[in-house]
Each structure stands twice: as C-alpha cells, then as structure tokens.
C-alpha cells in the first residue's frame, strides 16, 4: 500500500483532504478566505439553518418514509412533467439504482465515453452488454445501434461534469426513437440551471417529451441534498421494488426533505438569471484573454494536460485567493489534467473580473495562453 501511495505521489496523482468551510461564494481554508470557483451551488441559494429531525428510523420501505417524501416527489414529477418520481439519498445512488433496476443482463447499453463514473459503475453492475460511443458523436452512436439486435438503452449526461459541454440531445433523441431504444438522461448539472424555470437540458433543447428516464441531483442547482429519478409510473415502481441503493439504505432526514420542498417552492428565476449573466461574462472574459474552451455551461475547464503543471497552476490560483481544483487521472484521462471551475450566482462582477485577471496571469505564467 505504501508503494502505491508513493507511486501516486510521484505521478502527481495523490489526493489529500483539506479542512474547509463555506461562506456564500467563498471558501475558508486555514482561516483564510478565497473566492470559490469549485462550488456546485450554482444558483447560490444554500443558506440558513435546517430545522426538523436529523435522522429517519430506517429505510423508506420499513419505517423511514416521512410523509413529506410524497410531497417532494410530486413536485419533482411536476418539474419534469413525468408521472412519478422517487428520491434517493444521493445522485450517485440514483444512477446505480435506476440503471440496475431497468437494465437487464441480455440488454445492450450505449454509453457516452465521458459519462460520469456512477453511470459507468451502474452499467457494469447491471450485467448488460456495454457499448461505448464516441463523446457526443451521434453518427458513432447510430452505427453502433444499427449493428445490434436486442433491447437497447442509451445513457448520456445532459451537461458533462468535467467538460461543461451539452449533450447533442436533439440528434440523440431522434436516433433513440428511430431505433426503438430507451433513453436515460443524467441531468445532474443541467437540472434547475437550463430551460424554462430550470427544467433542464431536455427543456432548453425542446426534447423533454422524448426522454424516457430522468436521473438528477438535488445537491447542485437546487442547493439541497439527494438525488432522484422521474419517469413513467411503471419505471419508478420497478426501481422502488428492485433498486438496492433505495431498498437497503436509511432514508434521507426529514430536515433535508423539507429543505428541498422549500427550495422547489421558492422563486429561483432571479438567481438563475444572475447565474447566466455571470456565466456569459466569464466565458466572454476567458475568450478575450485567449483561453479556448468547449464549455457552454457553468462548468468551465481550463485544459492543462500535464498533471504537475495542473497542480502548480492550482497552487498559483490559491496563492491569489482563488480556489479552483485541479482535476487529474483517474477522473479524466492521463495527460488531460485541467482546472475545473464552476460559476455560481454568488459571484459578483468584481469577483469575476478579479478571477479573470488572475487567470490571465496564470495562463501566461504556465504558457497555456
């Protein structure tokens, strides 16, 4: 084990925990406040104390099914225009639970090569035959589907978590329909951010009705905690009965459920408009400086390549009171290390301008621009 740790350190891949606390759009490390460019609280609404009980007595199928779960799930179904929804303790568990419940051993799963690890693990656990298609490549997906006979599932993220680009859902939904496939969308980073009233990437691209199963998170755009799936009633009922990550785990605390209900019932549009104003300003600023990014969302990677250079880049930003994490293998491919930044509604114009100023200095210092 020590040898493995030494090798990780030599490869600039060793990860360490650091003690932090969050203050709106800032992060406090060693009693020093930094501008936080690594938050998933996109709308900037995660504030205040949470009341109610901090535990449930057991799993939801035993005695932990607080009455407010149903209220929350009805709100989520309305949000996604689906028949039924079910809440999981985390988004990761929602992916594991939904995919392993719906997909069977003799099925074929077509998964984008840059899908989140929770999707990858869920596909493996399902026992299905897995076909990986090139990232966001509708033609490659079509070719692979045409070569396959049997029940087919297509799984993609809406907004890709490490690149910030958006799935080619218009083409993918048409291909899915033409091949009689079942389309599963993980919209963890698009939900509550994109579309009318934050209904997600499917809504902004006009294909909501063509998506069969939605999987998403409550801990990002909604600023709460947990994950959920929304689909037709039979799909959700199957997950309730077969999903191990739902059946064999304690239910979320009532405090979290009530907090999520409060967030869903609040008017989030002002925060969402502020977020998009910040996103556009940051993208434009990066472009003016000379950075090239394929992102079209609040997730913006600066591609570095070399792992050590990415670590040094991150340390330089931190020295200027900006916190943005270097992302390395195995989260991304070797040689594709990056600084992954996420813009939120917390950020002020002054803070965005300062971040761009520091990023320009860092880009020139490390010969990225």
Model-derived regions: residue spans:
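Conserved PLP-binding catalytic core of the aspartate aminotransferase-like
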Residues: 273-283, 287-321, 343-345
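PLP-dependent enzyme catalytic core of the Aspartate aminotransferase-like
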Residues: 48, 74, 78, 319-320, ...
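Structural motif of enzymes handling amino- and sulfur-group chemistry
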Residues: 234, 251-268, 278, 287
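Active-site phosphate-binding strand-loop segment of PLP-dependent enzymes
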Residues: 40, 131, 135-185
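Conserved N-terminal alpha-helix of the aminotransferase class I/II PLP-enzyme fold
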Residues: 53-91, 279
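Active-site PLP attachment segment
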Residues: 203-238
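N-terminal "arm"/small-domain region of PLP-dependent enzymes with the aminotransferase-like
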Residues: 2-57, 150, 181
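Conserved PLP-anchoring active-site segment centered on the Schiff-base-forming lysine
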Residues: 98-117
């Amino acid at each position: 084990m020590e040898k493995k740790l030494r090798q990780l350190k030599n490869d600039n891949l060793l990860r360490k925990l650091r003690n932090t606390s969050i203050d709106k759009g800032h992060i406090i490390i060693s009693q020093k406040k930094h501008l936080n460019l690594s938050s998933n609280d996109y709308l900037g609404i995660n504030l205040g104390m949470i009341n109610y009980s901090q535990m449930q007595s057991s799993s939801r199928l035993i005695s932990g099914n607080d009455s407010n779960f149903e209220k929350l799930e009805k709100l989520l179904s309305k949000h996604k225009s689906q028949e039924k929804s079910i809440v999981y303790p985390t988004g990761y568990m929602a992916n594991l639970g939904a995919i392993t419940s719906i997909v069977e051993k003799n099925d074929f799963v077509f998964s984008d090569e840059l899908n989140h690890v929770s999707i990858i693990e869920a596909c493996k656990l399902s026992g299905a035959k897995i076909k990986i298609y090139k990232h966001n490549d509708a033609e490659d997906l079509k070719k692979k589907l045409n070569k396959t006979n049997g029940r087919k599932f297509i799984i993609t993220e809406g907004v890709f978590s490490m690149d910030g680009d958006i799935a080619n859902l218009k083409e993918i939904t048409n291909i899915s329909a033409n091949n009689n496939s079942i389309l599963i969308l993980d919209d963890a980073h698009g939900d509550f951010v994109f579309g009318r009233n934050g209904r997600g990437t499917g809504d902004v691209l006009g294909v909501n009705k063509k998506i069969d199963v939605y999987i998403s998170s409550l801990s990002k755009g909604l600023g709460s905690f947990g994950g959920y799936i929304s689909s037709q009633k039979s799909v959700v009922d199957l997950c309730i009965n077969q999903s191990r990550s739902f059946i064999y785990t304690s239910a979320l605390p009532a405090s979290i459920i009530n907090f999520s209900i409060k967030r869903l019932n609040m008017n989030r549009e002002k925060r969402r408009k502020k977020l998009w104003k910040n996103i556009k300003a940051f993208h434009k600023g990066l472009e003016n400086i000379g950075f090239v990014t394929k992102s079209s969302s609040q997730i913006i990677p600066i591609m570095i390549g070399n792992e050590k250079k990415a670590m040094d880049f991150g340390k330089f930003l931190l020295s200027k009171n900006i916190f943005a994490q270097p992302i390395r293998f195995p989260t991304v491919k070797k040689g594709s290390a990056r600084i992954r930044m996420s813009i939120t509604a917390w950020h002020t114009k002054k803070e965005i301008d300062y971040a761009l100023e520091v990023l320009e200095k860092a880009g020139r210092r490390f010969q990225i621009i």
